[in-house]
């Protein structure tokens, strides 16, 4: 959308993502053997595009690329699970809430939501995947959702007691 007059790029597809992950894995193995650290990490989006599970949090070695979004989903998943442990048992509610996220992370967020719904009887969470109309539909990460897209796509929806939107 904003690339008029620039060198043409094409979106990464499933095959590209799989090949990139193989390359990153080979380099990680070599660096781990030689330097004791993986040094390079694949973007979360590559795992999603390839349909592969995210590496465990330990594979990100304290998340040195977190500011670039590398490992953000693995860390969020880990923190989410830790937060669930703090809930204890016996909680009940009749609350309905909504979560807005990018289309890339939608299934991941839905899996976390189902876990918390099982833990808290009566809680109903609706996940809204937000299509990025501002930057273009191939931009599918939560951190690049605009307020305009949120408002446009959630307007008129019954969001329940609270709407949770991505921080990054």
Task: List where the protein language model places each region.
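Auxiliary Fe-S-binding modules of radical SAM enzymes
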Residues: 2-168
